[in-house]
From Swiss-Prot:
It comes from Streptococcus pyogenes serotype M18 (strain MGAS8232). It catalyses: oxaloacetate + phosphate = phosphoenolpyruvate + hydrogencarbonate. Forms oxaloacetate, a four-carbon dicarboxylic acid source for the tricarboxylic acid cycle. InterPro entries: PEP_COase, PEP_COase_bac/pln-type, PEP_COase_Lys_AS, PEPCASE_His_AS, Pyrv/PenolPyrv_kinase-like_dom. Belongs to the PEPCase type 1 family. This is Phosphoenolpyruvate carboxylase.
Length: 920
């Protein structure tokens, strides 16, 4: 019997009960805001949407005034948000229940480690596995921070619903408090008035560390070690989960990311983790009242206690408290030294005896900052050893164990920050450096071989740098060198882990990587023997992915590269771009090209004695590589996950996965279990069959790519269709991120960034990037020979990659709505442009039919009943928003809305994204 999957809501009855209650409250609040007569409009359009009477719905919406639109669009935006909260609460409840009752579910870490423990290499795998979710600020999170905070309050209240029903707490008081928060969220601005700045993005993402991630990662790592120990495996400081960060370091296409934002990102992160430690030490101070008259501490604890400036007579016999006071004081000094910020959150209210006068002896021993997390951990270990010596092992568990585990994971830096820049920027900077140093006058005109020769020669000439104070530099070069200088300073101050990788967007050649090496050498981050920052190529387009193996084979052949990799435990990371490859070639071509590239790059690494690790640049939607995390990882090519995998978590996905600590724990658990299972599971499918499957896929994908590009790049009306029949213009003006919607002025599809591309197709409900070209390509293969449908059905049943590929298409099709898409098409100005819709419609119908045939299903989402039920309950609400959005766009484009009314469109964008749950 297959194990239960917890990735979506399961308890439909309790969810329906909660949603009915929330809806009743929202209705009462809305009636009071607009009156009973106006509320009848909401009721009537709700009925029309449920009946799918879209013609009449369109007429009713067209007669709603701009003023009425504000509350109506708000109502239908808040309602799916409340449904989301209820489903999230149910998932958190289910996770706790399954764990507390020791029930098995898919991806449960206890099962994964139990299965692994009996294998010869089980301990090695558990020691080495490292999964790194990298949080990014990609602009797909449309919710304001204030709305997210109110959402959290409602979530916490709904967690108490079962207790309220059972009478454990007052049901009436509970309802009153819930009503207050629903009223607040209904009457709070949904849309940001100003565009986010990078500093806002840094601050916003930090709330997830404070609220859930630090606790979840720490708890999960402790459980990981305990489970291994249960099976006789003593692990030495494993790190199954560490965190990554792009915000503040990702400057590709974002001119607002500078040396200052990089420094701010690292400093804020350090401040957050040090505050966490300081708070934990305060809690330990409060609870560790052990008296030396009853328990004799060891000499090291006595030494720490003697250094404390808390010399109150009330603490004379409490050496552990004084030791914790001293450690905390050292942490405060560390925070001042590393961040130039005192521990502002700390006060006497947290239990410290801040009023105690320091003794003369303590003034002779001023508090010193820790030189490193190792020194901090050593003091904690001394206390642990003293407790063990006295038989107090039970006292180690809890806060002391948690903070000791946290310092192993987070150090003083919290999360490693990636730097990223486009290859063209680096080339321009290196060309300027070479010209200024009178080495090459026109570097960009050189052949690839000539470029590499020049670059390697410069890298071998130590310690010579190319820049000189006597030579004027462009603003671009000054800015780039400042960022790299800041990176070096941060590594010197916070440790090597704070910045470990630099990613090169649009890597197209070996010289792209050596150009970055030159820039790093300029500030002392690279020399002949060592690269303190790993150079990570990002292969994004179909063409670049096809060329990746040749590029990496040539790069790995250089002696200087071998030296760099040798100092990095023989790892070379490669980032794979799901978004641009999809925009370039369509869903099938992207998925298959990425799959093949991983196989081939892994083989190249083995030839050179290098462990290739992959960084998956996924988004939330299927069109950007999204989908269920467990399935995505376990369907990776066999052998492609050695022991380390990184993946981006961005936008609305961060809130969905890490909004509370229970769900965060579960999603991190899924990532670890999926990675281990993919590492150790033998190839399920027969190897001879796999070869034939690959031949079939090569043929199908070639057709799919051609069909996709014929419409997107060859149809002269497609560009206008996208810009007129979707809210792309309105999305681009929405204040959801610091980064521009395009790297440059948009004159063609290739110039548009992948996120607004996918986001806009989600809004008009076509979901184009997640399926277009799939149906025709499969149909051609099926029609080619008798038995081909059966071959595809067999592939679906036996090949995890193919099964995941089609399941994602199934999910995307279920969220699309061609009736609504038709109405968006009417926004186009000419019939030729509107006719593009019919090409899309034909392919959509064909894709749906073919997918169902291969799956041998009668309807979409047969394998995912919980998602099917969830969509059924929420679709009527945000379908209404689409019709409201279409009407508002008509008015806006016909100058029937003023600038203040533009935010009405933004409200609908917000609501639709909320209802879909994965928007970009």
């Amino acid at each position: 019997m297959p194990l239960k999957k917890l990735e979506s809501s399961n308890n439909q009855a309790i969810i329906a009960e909660e949603v009915a209650l929330l809806k009743e409250m929202l209705e009462n609040i809305t009636r009071r805001m607009i009156g009973d007569d106006a509320f009848t409009v909401i009721e009537s359009i709700m009925v029309l949407s449920e009946k799918q009477d879209y013609i009449e719905l369109e007429k009713v919406v067209a007669n709603i005034s701009n003023q009425e639109m504000e509350v109506i669009s708000r109502y239908f935006s808040i309602l799916p948000l409340l449904i989301n909260i209820s489903e999230d609460v149910d998932l958190a409840y289910e996770i706790n229940y399954q764990n507390n009752t020791d029930t098995d579910y898919l991806g449960k870490l206890a099962l994964t480690i139990k299965d692994l423990a009996g294998k010869d290499n089980g301990k090695d795998i558990l020691e080495q596995v490292n999964v790194v979710p990298v949080l990014t600020a990609h602009p797909t999170q449309v919710q304001r921070k204030t709305i997210l905070e109110l959402t959290t309050h409602i979530h916490k209240l709904l967690r108490k619903y079962r207790d309220a029903k059972a009478g454990v707490i007052s049901l009436e008081k509970w309802r009153q408090e819930l009503y207050r928060y629903v009223e607040m969220i209904m009457q709070t601005d949904i849309i940001r008035e100003k565009k986010l700045q990078v500093k806002n993005e840094i601050k916003n993402v930090m709330q997830y560390y404070d609220g859930s991630l630090i606790q979840a990662v720490t708890k999960l790592t402790t459980e990981y070690k305990n489970l291994a120990q249960k099976h006789g495996l003593e692990l030495d400081n494993p790190k199954p989960i560490t965190m990554g960060m792009w915000i503040g370091g990702d400057r590709d296409g974002n001119p607002f990311v500078t040396a200052e934002t990089l420094c701010l990102s690292a400093t804020v992160q350090s401040e957050v983790i040090l505050n966490y430690y300081i708070d934990k030490l305060a809690a330990l101070y409060r609870t560790f009242s052990l008296s030396s008259t009853l328990v004799q501490p060891n000499s090291e604890v006595e030494r720490l206690a003697s250094l404390s400036q808390d010399q109150s007579i009330y603490r004379g016999n409490e050496p552990y408290r004084r030791a914790f006071h001293y450690i905390q004081s050292c942490l405060k000094q560390t925070q001042i030294q590393l961040t130039n910020q005192p521990a502002a959150r700390m006060s006497s209210s947290v239990g410290l005896n801040t009023s105690a006068c320091p003794s003369p002896a303590s003034l002779e021993n001023p508090i010193l900052a820790y030189d490193s997390p190792v020194d901090f951990k050593a003091d904690l270990k001394a206390i642990e050893q003293s407790l063990l010596d006295n038989g107090n092992s039970a006292l180690i568990e809890g806060d002391l164990r948690e903070v000791m585990q946290a310092v192993d994971i987070f150090g003083f830096f919290l999360a490693s920050i990636d730097m990223r820049q486009d290859s063209s920027v680096q080339e321009a900077c290196v060309a300027e450096l070479l010209k200024g140093a009178n080495i090459v006058d026109d570097y960009s005109s050189l052949s690839e071989t000539e470029k590499c020769d020049v670059l390697v020669q410069q890298l071998m000439e130590e310690p010579r740098t190319l820049s000189s104070a006597a030579v004027a530099k462009s603003d671009l070069l000054e800015k780039e060198l400042a960022i790299y200088t800041t990176a070096r300073e941060l590594k010197d101050k916070l440790g090597e882990e704070v910045i470990k990788q630099h990613i090169i967007s649009h890597t197209e050649s070996v010289s792209d990587m050596f150009e970055l090496a030159i820039m790093l050498k300029e500030v002392g981050l690279v020399d002949q023997q060592r690269a303190r920052v790993q150079i990570v190529p990002l292969f994004e387009t179909i063409e670049d992915l096809d060329n990746a193996c040749d590029i990496m084979a040539a790069y790995l052949s250089h002696d200087i590269v071998k030296s760099w990799i040798a100092t990095n435990r023989n790892y070379q990371e490669i980032m794979l771009g799901y978004s641009d490859s999809n925009k370039d070639g369509g869903y099938l071509a992207s998925g298959w090209t990425l799959y093949k590239a991983q196989n081939e790059l892994t083989a190249i690494g083995e030839e050179h004695g290098v462990k290739i690790t992959f960084f998956h640049g996924r988004g939330g939607t299927v069109g950007r590589g999204g989908g269920p995390s467990y399935d995505a990882i376990t369907s990776q090519p066999f052998g492609s996950i050695k022991d380390r995998i990184r993946l981006t978590e961005q936008g609305e996905i961060i809130e969905n996965k890490y909004g509370n600590k229970d769900v965060a724990y579960y999603h991190l658990e899924m990532l670890i279990s999926a990675s281990i299972n993919r590492m150790v599971t033998q190839m399920i499918t027969d190897s001879n069959e796999i070869d034939s499957f690959r031949e079939i896929m090569d043929s199908i994908v070639a057709d799919s790519n051609m069909i996709y590009r014929k419409l997107v790049f060859d149809n002269p009306h497609f560009y206008d269709y996208f810009f007129e029949a979707s809210p792309i213009k309105e999305v681009s003006s929405l204040n959801i991120g610091s980064r521009p919607a395009a790297r440059k002025t948009i004159t063609e599809i290739t110039g548009l960034r992948a996120i607004p591309w996918v986001f806009s197709w989600s809004q008009n409900r076509i979901m184009f990037p997640g399926w277009y070209g799939v149906g025709s390509a499969f149909k051609r293969y099926i029609d080619r020979a008798q038995g081909n449908l059966e071959r595809l059905q067999h592939m679906y049943q036996t090949w995890p990659f193919f099964h995941s590929l089609l399941s994602n298409v199934d999910m995307v099709l279920s969220k699309s709505n061609m009736n609504i898409a038709f109405q968006y098409a009417q926004l186009a100005e000419s019939q030729d442009v509107r006719d593009v819709f019919y090409e899309i419609l034909d392919e959509w119908q064909l894709t749906k039919n073919v997918i169902l045939a291969i799956q041998d299903h009668d309807d979409l989402l047969e394998d995912n009943p919980s998602l099917k039920h969830s969509l059924k309950s929420r679709l009527p609400y945000f379908n209404v928003l689409n019709y409201i959005q279409i009407e508002l766009i008509k008015r806006w484009r016909n100058n029937q809305l003023d600038e203040n009314d533009e935010k009405l469109i933004h409200t609908t964008i917000n609501g639709i994204a909320t209802g879909l749950r994965n928007s970009g």
